[in-house]
């Protein structure tokens, strides 16, 4: 089965304009409204969680990735939205949350983070290794370092997915967003007076 985001990309290549909003919230009311909208319009719903909101230590919501997934799934079931209409995503997953730690610790946490997101069933994984950690040298982070860290996280995510697939053969393979060509986590750091499509 093809991922709904890949289906949309195929349509766009054919000149068919389409898209869906992304809801980056752990607020149950926001999630419920998003799920209801998806059911009413018969479109997939994309709900994103950040590493600060949801992680292996509970994040500020107190939820691990599997907890968040099950919460959304339970809400979707109550509304009557099938699981295959849900796209759960991890946003800016990587060492950002652990920037004050040295690379070995920050990456150990990051590997476990992306593993748990994929293992829980999240199917859109944004890997972002562009942020420095405590023992990175001054200046720009080298492309080789960013790529090495990203490859390590991709491998961890795929391990989580393969374990999920062994238990749930119809589990959808995740799609990946790599890098940080999107606004930085939390939004821009300077005033903006225009909107850039990313």
Task: Identify the residue ranges that each predicted region occupies.
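Low-complexity, flexible helical/coil segments
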Residues: 57-61, 80-88, 123-129, 159-164
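Alpha/beta catalytic barrel-like cores
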Residues: 1-86, 193
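Helix-rich catalytic cores of soluble enzyme domains
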Residues: 94-198
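Hydrophobic faces of well-ordered beta-strands that scaffold small-molecule active sites
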Residues: 19-24, 45-49, 84-92, 123-129, ...
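Glycine-rich, aromatic-flanked loop segments that form ligand/cofactor-binding clefts
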Residues: 46, 71-101, 169-175
């Amino acid at each position: 089965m093809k991922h709904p985001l890949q289906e949309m990309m195929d349509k766009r290549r054919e000149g068919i304009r389409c898209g869906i909003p992304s809801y980056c919230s752990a607020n149950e009311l926001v999630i419920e409204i998003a799920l209801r909208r998806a059911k009413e319009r018969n479109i997939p719903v994309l709900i994103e969680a950040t590493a600060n909101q949801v992680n292996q230590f509970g994040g500020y919501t107190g939820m691990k990735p599997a907890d968040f997934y099950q919460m959304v799934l339970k809400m979707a079931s109550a509304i009557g939205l099938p699981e295959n209409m849900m796209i759960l995503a991890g946003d800016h997953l990587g060492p950002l949350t652990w920037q004050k730690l040295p690379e070995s610790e920050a990456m150990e946490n990051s590997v476990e983070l992306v593993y748990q997101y994929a293992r829980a069933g999240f199917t859109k994984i944004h890997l972002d290794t562009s942020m420095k950690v405590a023992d990175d040298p001054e200046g720009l982070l080298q492309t080789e370092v960013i790529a090495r860290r990203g490859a390590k996280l991709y491998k961890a995510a795929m391990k989580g997915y393969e374990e999920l697939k062994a238990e749930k053969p119809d589990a959808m393979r995740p799609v990946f967003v790599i890098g940080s060509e999107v606004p930085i986590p939390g939004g821009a750091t300077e005033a903006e007076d225009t909107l850039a499509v990313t």
